Amino acid sequence: MRELEFESGGEIEVSVSSDAAYEIHLHGYDVSEDVPAGGSAEFSVPADIEGVFEMEIEDTAVPIAEISVVPG
């Protein structure tokens, strides 16, 4: 699982690619993106909530990243 850190007040920018089609969900921010099979999806979200949040494959609850938003 990847561990990523962003500063509050900036942007959370993450690219997710996959061989299979999945819905990827970022908890805490409650945003999701569909990743097509063999493709990728881009997350770009204002980093306005501080804390540690899990990004996961929604249907299987498999975590793919831990997103930390720290004071800027």
Task: Say what each PLM segment does.
Residues 1-11:
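N-terminal edge beta-strand
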Residues 2-4, 30-34:
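Beta-strand-rich interaction surfaces with strong enrichment in secreted/lumenal proteins
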Residues 8-10, 20, 39, 51:
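Surface-exposed loop/turn positions
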Residues 11-15, 42-45:
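Short linear motifs in intrinsically disordered
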Residues 16-22:
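Short proline/glycine-enriched turn/loop motifs at strand-loop junctions of beta-rich domains
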Residues 23-30:
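Short, surface-exposed beta-strand/strand-loop-strand elements in extracellular ectodomains
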Residues 35-72:
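Extracellular/periplasmic metallocenter environments
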